């Protein structure tokens, strides 16, 4: 396990670690396998890399638009960064992509708001969420705006992120080598279930941990607009 702020410094060096932490808190709750579906949500989130990849592939095959990973990078942004689904679920690679998107938003915002660092940063949060400098400031009755949620998470207590551990040098005789044990595969790992009437949430919703991940037969909602973030249904996308 690696402290998030350490990981952010290494993988997203162009964004202040606590700023990245606030976005990640709102986007995924520090879940590297999170998937947010536009127009719906998963009944439960994937619990492993294999399940997350399979879920993403199934959603793509059915025509759904979604964001994925710890910083919730939209699927349509992956080709721009040469990323596969497997790489997008890697916390470091996902943070790197997310930070590049936020950095681009901030650079454009500060040009429009010279000398207003914090104002430009908030505009960048809106851009990260909605693809523009205004959508992230919109509120709904009883719910704060996306920008307000991120700002409120500025002092969030970060969670450690699981990574491949550092090797420890030990005498050969003391380093026991065991054959890998074949793990039992998650039930119905080849499909996902999408709830077409999700409740309003600020991050991908999680259901019962033991519920199978399936895909309903209903067709996804279509949109004429370019991919953009919409966090009103527990989905955050670019």
Swiss-Prot record:
Pfam families membership: SLT (PF01464)
InterPro entries on file: Lysozyme-like_dom_sf, Transglycosylase_SLT_dom_1
UniProt keyword Lyase, yes or no: no
Keywords: Virulence
Keyword Cell cycle applies: no
Annotated stretches, region: Disordered: 197-238
Gene induction: Specifically induced within macrophages by phagosome acidification. Induced at 37 degrees Celsius in minimal medium, suggesting that nutritional stress is a regulating signal.
SUPFAM superfamilies: Lysozyme-like (SSF53955)
Biological role: The VirB system could be required for the establishment of the replication niche in the host.
Remaining remarks: Transcription of the operon is maximal in early exponential phase.
Family: Belongs to the virb1 family.
Full protein name: Type IV secretion system protein virB1
Organism annotation: Brucella suis biovar 1 (strain 1330)
Top-level taxonomy: Bacteria, Pseudomonadati, Pseudomonadota, Alphaproteobacteria, Hyphomicrobiales
Name of the coding gene: virB1
